Amino acid sequence: MASDFQMKAMNKVHGATLKLSGGGLGWHMYGMPVVQLTTIGRKSGQPRTSLLTSPVQNGNAFVIVASRGGDDINPAWFLNLKANPEVTVKSGRKPAVKMRARIAEGDERDELWKRIMDYKPHYGGYQKKTDRVIPLVILEPIA
């Protein structure tokens, strides 16, 4: 599993690629769209931005996976959006959109997990590395 330092470094390199290319490169990774998720830090109150892949999309909603590579702890961005579910999401060259995050549960989570596994089975390897149930988060536009 990648360390916090490695994950932050990868995120910074990815962000630099987006910036240097004028947003022309970096919006797809491993065949999935990339979303730029901005949460409010649960401790700091400051904006925190992460670049994440979305293996499933439903209309204007994105599904993101709080796998943290199969680590035993949830990613900081997940803890932040649990504390404050109002987030900002940017994907591609489209403007950023205010969205609300919610955690998929029960049958909805089961159906989404199946879709994710059918499309990107490597997520199953992450689940095998940890005892926690990897959360699936749905990002929906605020009407």
Residue ranges of model-derived segments:
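Short helix-to-loop capping/linker segments positioned immediately adjacent to catalytic or ligand/cofactor-binding
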Residues: 24-25, 123-127
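Short coil/turn segments at secondary-structure boundaries
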Residues: 28-30, 127-131
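Short beta-strand segments
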Residues: 32-67
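Active-site beta-strand termini and strand-to-loop segments that position acidic
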Residues: 57, 140-141
